[in-house]
């Protein structure tokens, strides 16, 4: 009996070590893939597809039939989702201001990604603002890594709660 315990405790098959390494390598390749996708995304629909994909990968949740609209809203609103609807309304004016001030597609895409992810999480049933801000950060960190602008922006927004 002691021999069996010793054997099981100290024996680590090489296959298990390789499986762990593959999982880490796969996560790094996913981070690179998502970073490349968000940096190259053209238009709101491209970013919207990344939002849905990263939320599904991170939380295992998705919602069909969501519609994205653009409207000119007050500047204190990035976007909104009215509970009970399939609509997310993105503030076109605010996005245009960020675009003209930064002149950086990468920053605009990160900004739009963060706002849409936030509202999509509300649409999935997460009502608490502080919970949603934390989830946006967690999803961003998992999918884009700690050093990407998406995660940096999500971190700043999370600190406001």
Go through each PLM region and give its residues:
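Long, hydrophobic, amphipathic alpha-helical segments used as structural scaffolds
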Residues: 55, 59, 124-128, 147
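Active-site recognition of the HExxH zinc-binding catalytic motif
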Residues: 110, 114-126, 133
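Hydrophobic (often cysteine-bearing) scaffold residues that line and stabilize catalytic clefts
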Residues: 43, 47, 109, 113, ...
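Active-site scaffold of zinc-dependent metalloenzymes
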Residues: 69-109, 113
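N-terminal low-structure segments adjacent to metalloprotease catalytic domains
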Residues: 1-30, 34
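Post-HExxH zinc-binding segment in Zn-dependent metallohydrolases
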Residues: 127-161
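Extended low-complexity intrinsically disordered regions
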Residues: 32-87
């Amino acid at each position: 009996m002691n021999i069996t315990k010793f054997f099981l405790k100290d024996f680590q098959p090489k296959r298990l070590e390789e499986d762990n390494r593959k999982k880490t390598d796969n996560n790094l390749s996913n981070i690179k893939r998502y970073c490349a996708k968000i940096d190259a995304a053209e238009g709101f629909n491209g970013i919207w597809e990344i939002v849905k994909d990263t939320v599904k990968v991170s939380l295992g949740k998705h919602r069909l039939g969501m519609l994205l609209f653009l409207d000119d809203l007050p500047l204190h609103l990035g976007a909104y989702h009215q509970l009970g609807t399939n609509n997310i309304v993105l503030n076109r004016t605010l996005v245009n201001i960020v675009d003209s001030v930064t002149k950086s597609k990468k920053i605009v895409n990160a900004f739009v990604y963060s706002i849409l992810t936030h509202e999509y999480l509300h649409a999935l049933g997460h009502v608490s603002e502080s919970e949603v801000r934390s989830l946006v950060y967690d999803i961003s960190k998992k999918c884009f890594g700690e050093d990407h602008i998406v995660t940096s922006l999500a971190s700043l927004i999370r600190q406001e709660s």
